[in-house]
Structure formats: C-alpha cells, structure tokens
Regions:
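A short glycine-threonine-serine/GTX helix/turn-capping micro-motif
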Residues: 46-52, 145-154
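Predominantly a Rossmann-like dinucleotide-binding segment in NAD(P)-dependent oxidoreductases
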Residues: 3-74, 81
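Short, flexible active-site-adjacent loop segments at beta-strand->alpha-helix junctions, enriched
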Residues: 1, 28-33, 107, 121, ...
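A general structural signal for well-ordered alpha-helical segments in protein cores
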Residues: 3, 7, 58-59, 88, ...
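Contiguous beta-strand/loop segments that form the cofactor/metal-binding neighborhood of enzyme cores
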Residues: 60-133, 150, 161-169
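Active-site loop of classical SDR/Rossmann-like NAD(P)-dependent oxidoreductases
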Residues: 150-161, 177
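A structural signal for the main folded, soluble domain(s) of proteins
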Residues: 137-141
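C-terminal helix-rich "cap/oligomerization" subdomain common to oxidoreductases
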Residues: 96, 162-197
Length: 197
C-alpha cells in the first residue's frame, strides 16, 4: 500500500493539515480463509494468523497516517483458534499526540477493507484502503470531494518500480518505506502476539 499513487495524495493532504489535527483512525480488513489457503493462513509454523497475514496492512496504514509508532496497544478482543493462531483481533492503539486508532483484522469473516481518518477540521474515508484508488475528503464548510487515483495495472507495479528505482540509484532501502518502518512494524506485531500468550 505504501507506493500506491493515492497514498502520495493522502500524505500530501495530511501534511498540509487539510483535515486538521488527526484525532482518530479506524481500519478493518477481513475475509474467510478456505481450502488450501486456510492451511497456510492458520498454520503457526508458516506465520499463520490474521495479524501477520493481513493485520500488517492495517498497521502499515496507521503508520502511513501517523508517521509514528503507537505509545500503547491494547487488545480489545482476540480469538485464538484450535491451531493456536489468531483468526480475529481488535486492537486499540494510542499515540503520543493523543490520537487513537482501532484496527480489526480477521481471516474468519468477510469485512470491507475500509478506513477512516478523523481530524479536527474534517475526515477522509477510503472505501478500500488496501487496493486504494479512491478516497472521500470531507472538510468542514465544504462539499465532500471524491479523489481518484487509478492504478496502471493492479497496484503491485508501483512496488516494482520503487525497487527498480532504488537499485538503479544504489540505495539499500527505499525512502518511502524504510528499513526503520519494516523493523517497527515487525516489532509491533511481535509485541502484540506476545501479549496474547
């Protein structure tokens, strides 16, 4: 999600303070894992579970919006299945600036992949934050604005282009999605999972 054109626009809107100070963010992502997919997605030896499989998208979205690591993470609900992995969790995150966030991820239920950012002057709604091509910007005193940034093919091309750009320039890491981002998200997911044991 980090390299999609819509996220360039989103970052710009947030940096300009169009919706004011961010107060709350919510995102959800869920589907029913079936068939051969179910084995991998539930198997602890293969990194199974909703948090590792799709929660990374939610937590990545929150990092894009806040630019920070949460100060506190509280699991409001988690369901550990018979395989020993999570098939559902609801997390509440709190950041140093007082912003709060809610992240819901499940591989046992269909959920729309939507997200909302609430600010002091308005809000932004993404009907599908993972395959993000559309967002609706609502600013106090103005008509809602639909912003569209369609992808060229399927969205993965932007990740490929960024890798190609970095290799050509001799970079070891992207400045869009840094090693620091990757380590922070991995540590966050590890800490969340450890809190469930």
């Amino acid at each position: 999600i980090w390299f999609l054109p819509l996220y360039d626009r989103l970052r710009s809107i947030l940096q300009q303070g169009v919706i004011g100070e961010i107060k709350h963010i919510s995102c959800q992502y869920g589907f029913v894992a079936t068939g051969a997919r179910k084995e991998r997605k539930f198997n602890p030896a293969l990194g199974g579970g909703a948090l590792l499989d799709i929660g990374i998208y939610n937590l990545g979205f929150l990092r894009i919006v806040t630019g920070n690591e949460p100060q506190n993470v509280e699991t409001q609900k988690v369901h550990i299945n018979e395989y020993g992995t999570d098939d559902y969790s609801c997390l509440k995150l709190t950041y140093n600036d007082g912003c709060t966030a809610e992240s819901v991820q499940t591989i046992g239920q269909e959920l729309k992949r939507n997200a909302r950012i609430e600010g002091t002057k308005g809000s932004i709604f993404l009907p599908d934050f993972q395959h993000a091509e559309t967002m609706i910007l609502e600013v106090e005193g103005k008509e809602p604005e639909t912003i569209e940034c369609p992808v060229d093919i399927n969205g993965f091309e932007y990740e490929i282009r960024e890798v190609s750009r970095c290799v050509k320039l001799g970079y070891c890491s992207s400045d869009v999605y840094t090693a620091k981002d990757s380590i922070a998200l991995t540590r966050l997911m590890y800490d969340i999972r450890m809190s469930w044991s």
